[in-house]
Amino acid sequence: VAIGAHLAKKVNIPAQEASKILDAVSFLKDADENSEDKPLLGRRVAIYGGGNTAMDAARTAKRLGADEAMIIYRRDREHMPAHEFEADEALSEGVKIHWLSTIKNMETSSITVEKMQVVDGKAVPTGEYETLEADSLILALGQEADTDFLKHIEGITFKEDGTTVEVNPAMMTGYPGIFAGGDMVPSERTVTIATGHGKKAARNIDAWLRNSIYEKPANNPLVTIEKLQIWFKTNAEKKAQQHLEIEKAVETFDEIVAGYTT
């Protein structure tokens, strides 16, 4: 079972009935250039979260015509899960980031945030509040797997969050013959990790069907540059990739980073 994590995480934010609150996954899907109904966001858009999805949502909002897109994140940049280049590109496109801030409530055209401070590596409330003008709010607090269909199966157990499935080293759940991997098990959520889970599970499934145990072979030796015996070593500068000008980038969904060749 490898169904991914496609459900947006929910958070309870006190809001007026007229407040416009969206989840980032649905927003990005609706914002697709082939979609007939583009989201109506207003002039000022707030994005709650600090991951790559939050960066994508903020940059997409700018491309849909928002005058201002601001990210609200409860920790500092050092602890932000988004890739460094994603944050750099978002900032260069005019996205504002409010660090150490958490949303307390939302009204029709404004958001109240509480400032945080880092104490012993943790973000804690300060009791200091700030009001930010915003016409809409996009929640980008991560995704989770829809694992409800597994909860009636005896033997399958879940982590504390109730959405990730516990597996043994062979990628098998507590029910014999049911294996799981990817975003629905405790791990880093990357394509590389999910691909590795698939390969590992396939080998163990094959062994289980044969009523045997898969034994992992020894790792191949690591070949360093010294062992390659390359007769030359260049000190040439790294070739820079061309970037689309910021003024044009925020008006299009085209690639903004070109390849190494033209």
Question: What feature does the model see in each segment?
Answer:
Residues 1, 107-131:
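Conserved beta-strand-loop-beta-strand element in the redox core of flavoprotein oxidoreductases
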Residues 58-103, 215-227:
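Rossmann-like dinucleotide-binding cores of NAD(P)H-dependent redox enzymes
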Residues 36-66:
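Rossmann-like NAD(P)H-binding beta-loop-alpha module
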Residues 1-30, 257, 261-262:
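Glycine/serine-rich phosphate-binding loop and adjoining beta1-alpha1 elements at the start
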Residues 57, 181-212:
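A conserved FAD-binding loop/helix module that cradles the flavin
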Residues 17-43, 120-188:
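FAD-site-proximal beta/loop scaffold in flavoenzymes
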Residues 16-31, 37, 79-108, 113-114, ...:
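N-terminal glycine-rich dinucleotide-binding loop that anchors FAD/FMN and/or NAD(P) in oxidoreductases
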Residues 89-92, 102-104, 109, 200, ...:
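Mid-to-C-terminal Rossmann-like scaffold of FAD/NAD(P)H-dependent oxidoreductases
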